[in-house]
């Protein structure tokens, strides 16, 4: 039994430092690197790619809405073509840094509001999936498990890694609880570790409303910018390995 453990990194920019990238890279099996729109800048992207390649983790682009002030977590209403183009732009930027460093881009995972909106909006899901396919149909798309983005991407012939979150609470419909709700962000390392093992071994976790929801995950996400992120990540990886679950990127590019 195995599971991919991914984390969002490279979100610092200019004088602003966000997250604990070095610690997260050492724990994860795949990483999602910001591409300059919600976070990141050229220097941060270059350094983060180099660190990821040295660690041997799978590297993915982490495109978001053009919203540095809101960290890409505010909804934006854009035409589908605009969404497709802004994702192509960001994938291209990160892909260039990866190739310049001698690596190969493995996957794409949308960020923040873009991720959440594409999980429930068919038109937006199609815009996201189309962007990935146009850049490189061999790229793996990381998407919320059970969401419309998963089905849309599969219809376009993309390989999809269905994602679950060990540091976020769920609503009964399988979507993530908004961050402004009490308890929406899991900050206790032991709780996060227990949830991770349950997700992999049983495929079920309780929602915030107490309902048991089904989650078939190929990859588990940890946020590098959450409070105590490094401690949570260490606890999750240790819990998985203690339970006999190997941590490894789940899909290989051909």
UniProtKB/Swiss-Prot annotation:
Enzyme Commission code: 3.5.2.9
Enzyme class: hydrolase
Species assigned in the record: Heliobacterium modesticaldum (strain ATCC 51547 / Ice1)
Function: Catalyzes the cleavage of 5-oxoproline to form L-glutamate coupled to the hydrolysis of ATP to ADP and inorganic phosphate.
BP GO annotations: carbohydrate metabolic process
Catalytic activity of the protein: 5-oxo-L-proline + ATP + 2 H2O = L-glutamate + ADP + phosphate + H(+)
Subunit structure: Forms a complex composed of PxpA, PxpB and PxpC.
InterPro entries assigned: Glyco_hydro/deAcase_b/a-brl, LamB/YcsF/PxpA-like
Protein name, UniProt field: 5-oxoprolinase subunit A
């Amino acid at each position: 039994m195995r599971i991919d453990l991914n984390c969002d990194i490279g979100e610092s920019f200019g004088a602003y430092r966000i997250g604990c990238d070095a610690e997260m890279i050492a724990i994860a099996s795949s990483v999602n690197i910001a591409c300059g729109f919600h976070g990141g800048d050229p220097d941060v992207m270059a350094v983060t790619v180099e660190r990821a390649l040295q660690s041997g983790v799978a590297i993915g682009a982490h495109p978001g809405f053009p919203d540095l002030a809101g960290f890409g977590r505010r909804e934006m209403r854009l035409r589908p073509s605009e969404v497709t183009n802004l994702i192509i732009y960001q994938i291209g930027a990160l892909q260039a840094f990866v190739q310049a460093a001698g690596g190969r881009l493995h996957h794409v995972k949308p960020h923040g509001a873009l991720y959440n909106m594409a999980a429930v909006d068919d038109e937006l899901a199609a815009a996201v999936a189309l962007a990935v396919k146009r850049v490189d149909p061999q790229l793996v798309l990381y998407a919320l498990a059970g969401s419309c983005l998963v089905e849309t991407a599969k219809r376009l012939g993309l390989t999809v890694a269905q994602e679950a979150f060990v540091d976020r609470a769920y609503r009964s419909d399988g979507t993530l609880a908004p961050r402004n709700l009490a308890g929406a962000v899991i900050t206790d390392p032991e709780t996060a570790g227990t949830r991770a093992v349950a997700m992999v071994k049983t495929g079920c976790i309780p929602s915030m409303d107490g309902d048991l929801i089904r989650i078939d995950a190929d990859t588990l996400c940890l946020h590098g910018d959450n409070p105590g992120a490094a401690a949570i990540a260490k606890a999750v990886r240790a819990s998985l390995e203690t339970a006999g679950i190997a941590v490894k990127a789940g899909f290989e590019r051909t």
